[in-house]
Amino acid sequence: MKIEKINSYLARDQFIVEIITDKGISGVGQSACWAYPEAVKAIVDRFKNILIGKDPFMIEEINQLLMRTGPFRGSVLSGAISCIDIALWDIKGKYFETPIWNLLGGKVRNKVRLHLLLGIIYGNSKSKNEGLYESAKKAVKDGFTALKIDPLPDNYYDLSLDQLIKETISTVAALREGAGSEVDIILEIHRKLTPMTSVHLAESIKEFNPMFFEDPIQIDSIISQSDIAKKVSIPIANGERMHSIWEFRELLANGGPQYVRPDVGLAGGITQTKKIASIAESYHSALITHNFLGPILTAASVHIDVSIPNFITQEYSLDDESEKNNYLISSLKREGGYIITPEKPGLGIEINKEIINQVPYEPLDLND
């Protein structure tokens, strides 16, 4: 079997690739380099002359070839390699009529625990905190056992440290009250703070027992990120913008974090993310893949989650279930706060060709 054709799709703000073989079996993948999907498409187009004619089962060889063909690295390149890798695993699963997780060593769980994204910014007003409280209660009633928010007020950069801490505490308190003590809460900072402020804030909210405190600072320095993990008493998570096994190795070797957060659509696909999971396992660190870009990357993440021992919970957005994704046909089944281990061959996602070709491309406004 050989790779015969590669189709690219820019739909909504996403880049999706379809790899078609001479046997008629096709696979789909998606990049998580969501700020620059056109650039990812340009790289995939450059890779076509390398890929066409290749055996799609030679996944590791292709992954290494694409990574090392040119002496350059970066998230756009890795985002392109990642979506190709996911599509190749999809082809392999379909050919052998088995789900991808079975090709990764088999399953170690029958369902995947989710943590629900309740939203990015809730602000600092009483009414918004009341809304957060109600949203948390509803999510728990729907069966979710872990909830995630960005707790910082939207004007965080204009506040004194005292104001920032007090208003963030108020928001976290509303989340904890709505969620109750039987539900885990997760706090995502989106790289907004300095190391000094991060440490102070993390210590101030530890009374609410967050599961972890995620991405407090910019990704510029691995050493600085690891240093925070050593200074605070609540678990730290980061890694969603990293794109190689070596970055994760150095992050962990420098003392942190307790949770690693690769994105399967950015960190080298299923092939490299599985390696990152093993590196993390050797440090007694858990893998919680970053994910909010739709059913393709949710499915790719779930196949990894099912096959590794050091999984805790999977990031999940209800946007996966919205009509906006009607150009994708998903076999994933959510029951309350869990996705049932998929049994369909391959990834379990198909493209609706009639619809995807009509979906407009709406790139992210970088001025927003």
Task: Describe the function of each predicted region.
Residues M1-V28, A32-C33, E323-N325:
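Structured beta-strand/loop patches that form or line metal/cofactor-binding pockets in enzymes
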Residues I20-T98:
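Metal- or metallocofactor-binding catalytic centers and their adjacent structured scaffolds
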Residues G24, F47, I84, E97, ...:
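Conserved, mostly hydrophobic/aromatic
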